[in-house]
C-alpha cells in the first residue's frame, strides 16, 4: 500500500513540473516556437539553449517572469529572439551575452523598468530592439553604446521622462532609421536628443505631452526624415515659419488631435517633398490663404474635425492635391465651382469628403452636381435620406457670404438636435 502511494505522489509531481514549462516545437530544424505552460516560469538552460542550428526562438506570452544565467547558451546561430508579452521585470547582467549573432530582440510588453549597464555589450549585431509597453523610466548613459548597428528602436508606451534623458545615449547608434517615443512624457527633452542620427526616417511622438513642436525633432541632421508624427499632443500654435526649414525629405506630417488654432502661412513652404498633412481634430477657425500653396508633392490634406467656415481654392493653388477632407467643420458653402477651380489651379482632386457640415442645401446641391460631373469620389453613403445633411430657408439659393453662416449653423444644430431626439424617442 505504502509503495503505491509514493509512486502516485511522484508521478503527480512530475506532471506538475512538466506542465509548468512552456512547450517548444522546432520547425525546419531551426525555428523554435514555444507556448505557455500552466504556471509562471523562470527560463533556465535546457528549454531552448544548446543548439547551434537554431536561428529563431519565439517565447512570446510564455509566462516567463525571470531569465536565469545560461538560458541562451550555445546558440551560435541565433539571430531572432522574441520574448514579448511575458512578465520579465529584470534582466540580469550577462543573460544575453551568449547569442552573439542576435539581430532581432523583442522585449515588448514586459515589466522592465531599467537595464543594468553592460546588458547589451555582447550582442553588437543587434539591428532591431523592441521595448514597447514596459515601464522603463531610465536609460543609463552607455547602455546602447555597443549597439552600433541599431536600426529600429521602439521605446513607446514606457515611463520615460524626456527632460531626464541624456542626449548622448544614442551617440554610438547613428544609423537608427526608426525611433518611437510615443506614449512617454517627452516635454522638455534636450534639444540635442537626436543629434547623433545620420539617417533617421521615422520619428513617432504621438501622445508625448508636447505643448509645441519640439526642437529636438527638427534639427538639421534630421533632413533625412520622411515621417514626423506629432499626433495627440497639446500643440496650440504653429507660428514660427522656420519650424520645419531643415526637413527637406519630409513626406508625412501628422498633427492630428492637437489644439492648433493658428498656423503661420509660410510654415509648410520649406517642405518641398511633403505628400500628406494631417491636421484633423484641431480647433482651426481659419486657414491662411497661402498655407498649402505651391507644394510640388502635396496630395493629401486632412482638415476633418476643425471649425473652419471658409476654405478658399487659393489655399491649395499650385499643389497637385488629390485627397481633401473638410468633413466635420462649420462650412455652409464653398466658392462656386470649387473642384473645377482646384483642378484649374494645379490640383488633381480625386477624393473629396465634406460631410457632415452645416451646409446650405442649395450650396450642397451645387457641390454634389459638380463632384458627380467631374467623377470625384465623395461620401456618397451619407446622402441616404436617413439624417439631415443640410438646411434651407424658403429661398433656395446658395448665399456665399460669411455673415449668413451663423444663422445656417444654428439652424443645422437645431435640426440635428430634433433628429436625435426623435430617434431616441
Ligand atoms: C556549438 O558550437 C560551438 C563552437 O562553434 C561549440 O563549442 C559547441 O560545442 C557547439 N554546441 C553544440 C550544442 O553543438
Ligand atoms: C514584438 O512583439 C509584439 C507583441 O508580441 C508584436 O506585436 C510586435 O510586432 C513585435 N515587434 C516587432 C518589431 O516585430
Ligand atoms: C479624410 O478624407 C481622406 C480622403 O480624402 C481619408 O483618407 C481620411 O481617412 C479622412 N479622414 C477622416 C478622419 O475620416
Regions found by a protein language model. Give the residues of each.
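Extracellular leucine-rich repeat
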Residues: 2-425
Amino acid at each position: 500500500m505504502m509503495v503505491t502511494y509514493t509512486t502516485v505522489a511522484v508521478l503527480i509531481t512530475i506532471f506538475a513540473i512538466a506542465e509548468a514549462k512552456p512547450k517548444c516545437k522546432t520547425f525546419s530544424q531551426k525555428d523554435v516556437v514555444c507556448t505557455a505552460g500552466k504556471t509562471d516560469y523562470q527560463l533556465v538552460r535546457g528549454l531552448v539553449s544548446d543548439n547551434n542550428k537554431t536561428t529563431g526562438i519565439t517565447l512570446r506570452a510564455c509566462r516567463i517572469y525571470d531569465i536565469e544565467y545560461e538560458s541562451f547558451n550555445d546558440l551560435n546561430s541565433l539571430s531572432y529572439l522574441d520574448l514579448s508579452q511575458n512578465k520579465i521585470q529584470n534582466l540580469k547582467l550577462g543573460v544575453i551575452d551568449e547569442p552573439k549573432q542576435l539581430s532581432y530582440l523583442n522585449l515588448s510588453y514586459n515589466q522592465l523598468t531599467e537595464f543594468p549597464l553592460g546588458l547589451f555589450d555582447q550582442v553588437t549585431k543587434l539591428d532591431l530592439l523592441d521595448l514597447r509597453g514596459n515601464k522603463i523610466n531610465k536609460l543609463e548613459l552607455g547602455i546602447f553604446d555597443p549597439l552600433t548597428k541599431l536600426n529600429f528602436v521602439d521605446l513607446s508606451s514606457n515611463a520615460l521622462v524626456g527632460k531626464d534623458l541624456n542626449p548622448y545615449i544614442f551617440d554610438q547608434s547613428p544609423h537608427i532609421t526608426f525611433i518611437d517615443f510615443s506614449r512617454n512624457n517627452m516635454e522638455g527633452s534636450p534639444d540635442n536628443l537626436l543629434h547623433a542620427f545620420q539617417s533617421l526616417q521615422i520619428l513617432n511622438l504621438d501622445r508625448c505631452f508636447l505643448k509645441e513642436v519640439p526642437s529636438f525633432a527638427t534639427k538639421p541632421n534630421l533632413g533625412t526624415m520622411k515621417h514626423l508624427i506629432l499626433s495627440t499632443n497639446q500643440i496650440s500654435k504653429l507660428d514660427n515659419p522656420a519650424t520645419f526649414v531643415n526637413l527637406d525629405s519630409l513626406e508625412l506630417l501628422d498633427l492630428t488631435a492637437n489644439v492648433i488654432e493658428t498656423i503661420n502661412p509660410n510654415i509648410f513652404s520649406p517642405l518641398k517633398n511633403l505628400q500628406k498633412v494631417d491636421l484633423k481634430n484641431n480647433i482651426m477657425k481659419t486657414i491662411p490663404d497661402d498655407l498649402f500653396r505651391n507644394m510640388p508633392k502635396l496630395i493629401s490634406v486632412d482638415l476633418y474635425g476643425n471649425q473652419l467656415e471658409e476654405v478658399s481654392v487659393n489655399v491649395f493653388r499650385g499643389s497637385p492635391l488629390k485627397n481633401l477632407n473638410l468633413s466635420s467643420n462649420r462650412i455652409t458653402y464653398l466658392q462656386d465651382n470649387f473642384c473645377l477651380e482646384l483642378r484649374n489651379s494645379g490640383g488633381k482632386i480625386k477624393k473629396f469628403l465634406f460631410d457632415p457640415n452645416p451646409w446650405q442645401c442649395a450650396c450642397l446641391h451645387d457641390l454634389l452636381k459638380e463632384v458627380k460631373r467631374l467623377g470625384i469620389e465623395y461620401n456618397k453613403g451619407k446622402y441616404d435620406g436617413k439624417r439631415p445633411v443640410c438646411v434651407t430657408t424658403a429661398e433656395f439659393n446658395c448665399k456665399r457670404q460669411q455673415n449668413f453662416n451663423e444663422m445656417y449653423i444654428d439652424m443645422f444644430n437645431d435640426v440635428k438636435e430634433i433628429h436625435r431626439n426623435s430617434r431616441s424617442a
